[in-house]
Structure formats: C-alpha cells, structure tokens
C-alpha cells in the first residue's frame, strides 16, 4: 500500500485565513465533481471510536449463575424420560433462589441471636427445621448431614 500524500502547506494557510468557512458544516463541492459519498455503517454502529469501544472486540457477556443444570440433573435421576420447559425451569430456578434466601436470612438471625460471627452447619440445620415444613425438613436435614459427612471425609 502506498503511503498517504502529505497535505500541502498552501491548503493549510487557506483554512487558517478563513475561519468563517470552518464554522460552516458543509463545504461546496467544486463544479463538475460529485461530492464523495459518506461511508455507511450497519444499523447500531457508530462512526469513529466514540464511547471508548475497542476495534474488533466483542462485548463480554455478563455471567448469570443459575441452578438450571443441577435441576436438570436431578430431574434425570428421578424421571429420566421426562423433560422440562424453559418457563418451568425458570420457575424452579426462582423457587430455589427464594428458598436459599429464606434459609440464609434465618441462619443469619440465629447467628446474631447467639452473638456468633459465623454461620455454621448447625445454624443452617436449625434454619432448615424452621423454614421447611414437617417431613420435608427431616429429609432435608438427613440429606444435608450426608452431604457434609461426604465433604469432610474426602
């Protein structure tokens, strides 16, 4: 590729002498020549490097943590032949987030009541007994105890 030609000093002097033309946004094209067409960009793109965008870089996706893969794994363990719609998956994810928040809030209250700075498995177990009803709480406590035992032994 050939290097760009340098601007002539005479053209620079003309621009300096007439500041009124500089203020006018559009210059008249010389007679006999068509004005150069502006470079058109696809919709949503802006000309130049406005906004600090780097050329050629894609916008990084925000990672959203969900329980969707774990819900799906449990579903396949319980009912291997059944699927789940995206709407139902979203509802299940919201349900798990809600239960998690309730358990965490209850465990935090228990730690505060006992003037302890740390939430331990004991606070979690008590909060499960308080938040979840009857038989569900018993099963959750037994599964939680099993998971903690498995974690500490490995």
Curated annotation (Swiss-Prot):
State the InterPro entries in the record.
Histone-fold, Histone_H2A/H2B/H3, Histone_H2B, HISTONE_H2B_site
**PTM (free text):** Can be acetylated to form H2BK6ac and H2BK33ac.
Q: Subcellular location, in the record's words?
A: Nucleus; Chromosome
Determine if Ubl conjugation is one of this entry's keywords. yes
Give an example GO cellular component term for this record.
Answer: nucleus
Q: Which residues form a coiled coil?
A: none
Q: Where is the composition biased (Basic and acidic residues)?
A: 1-25
* Segments of this protein annotated with the region Disordered: 1-62
Q: Which UniProt keywords apply?
A: Acetylation, Chromosome, DNA-binding, Isopeptide bond, Nucleosome core, Nucleus, Ubl conjugation
> Where's the Glycyl lysine isopeptide (Lys-Gly) (interchain with G-Cter in ubiquitin) crosslink?
150
Per the record, residues carrying N6-acetyllysine are 7, 39
Query: Pfam families given for it?
Result: Histone (PF00125)
A GO molecular-function descriptor:
structural constituent of chromatin
Q: Which family does it belong to?
A: Belongs to the histone H2B family.
What role does it play? Core component of nucleosome. Nucleosomes wrap and compact DNA into chromatin, limiting DNA accessibility to the cellular machineries which require DNA as a template. Histones thereby play a central role in transcription regulation, DNA repair, DNA replication and chromosomal stability. DNA accessibility is regulated via a complex set of post-translational modifications of histones, also called histone code, and nucleosome remodeling.
Outline the subunit composition: The nucleosome is a histone octamer containing two molecules each of H2A, H2B, H3 and H4 assembled in one H3-H4 heterotetramer and two H2A-H2B heterodimers. The octamer wraps approximately 147 bp of DNA.
Q: What is this protein called?
A: Histone H2B.5
Which organism encodes this protein? Zea mays (Maize)
């Amino acid at each position: 590729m050939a290097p760009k030609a340098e601007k002539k000093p005479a053209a620079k002097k003309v621009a300096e002498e007439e500041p009124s033309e500089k203020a006018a946004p559009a210059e008249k094209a010389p007679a006999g020549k068509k004005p150069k067409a502006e470079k058109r960009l696809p919709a949503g793109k802006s000309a130049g490097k406005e906004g600090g965008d780097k050329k050629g870089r894609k916008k990084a996706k925000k990672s959203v943590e969900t329980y969707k893969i774990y819900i799906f794994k449990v579903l396949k363990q319980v009912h291997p032949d059944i699927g789940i719609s995206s709407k139902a998956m979203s509802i299940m994810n919201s349900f798990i987030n809600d239960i998690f928040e309730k358990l965490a809030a209850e465990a935090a209250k228990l730690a505060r009541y006992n003037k302890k700075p740390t939430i331990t498995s004991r606070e979690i177990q008590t909060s499960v007994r308080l938040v979840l009803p009857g038989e569900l709480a018993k099963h959750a406590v037994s599964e939680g105890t099993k998971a903690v035992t498995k974690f500490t032994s490995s």
